[in-house]
Amino acid sequence: GAIIIAETVYENIKNEKQYHTMQAFPGIKSKWERYDRYDFKFKNRNAIVVVPQKAAPGNPWIWRPAFFAAFPSVDIALLANGFHVAYYDLTHLYGSPHAVKLGTEFCNYMRDFYQLSSKVTVEGFSRGGFFAFNWAAQNTDRVACLYVDAPLCDLFLWPGRDNKKLWNDVLKEWNLKDNQMTEDKGKSIYRLKALAEANIPIINVCGDSDEAVPFEQHMNIIRKRYLELGGTVRVITKLGCGHHPHSLTDPTPIVNFILKYTK
């Protein structure tokens, strides 16, 4: 009703017809890498959806829970392949049960209101990787594949108890006392059985000289265990590379992997 009234007033003042057009997604519309971008709030947290010029059949999408637009070569390539690119900011929630719940609600919203695919590719960079493993293990029926890049896989190594401020942030987000943060909560390896049983494929990119999240202490442990469980995992190692830059300048191997498992 308010829209009709506004259009009528505009027409009387300007003596020209004004038509209201619905946006594809809520929020503020802008451009990102040539594509329509929508910024909005969901459950009081920042969300972004970037829309392909022509959506691929089934409306496939990739979702980042942290660090929108950082090293976006894969996202840009997938947009060209008809994927929606979504971001829902759960960066500082450390993969907590609350974060997992919010992520599920966001995915339901994207599916139910905007008809995006019921299965999503989850893209976890750094600490976003820890969330990706946690969320995927509890939502295996909603996951097409995982793309994790230099992922944090062990909260006891980062931030670790020695970093008292960040460790207290972890405990606060998890609503735990220190002695309640056990290995089955703080290590991604405990998520792998559920992922392997659901045949969730994983692609990983890591630098072999990462000092922030060392490959041998994080993703290589995941790789070995996932293979033991019969899971599909591909690791791309960048020689001489540290934690940054993430991704690949030529993202073709990652994109092809994602396309293979979203058909």
Cite the ranges covered by each PLM segment.
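C-terminal catalytic histidine-bearing segment of alpha/beta-hydrolase fold enzymes
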Residues: A212, Q217-K263
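The feature captures the conserved acid-bearing segment of alpha/beta-hydrolase catalytic domains
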Residues: N168-N220, K224-L227
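Alpha/beta-hydrolase active-site loop
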Residues: Y94-Q115
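Short beta-strand element of the alpha/beta-hydrolase
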Residues: G58-A66
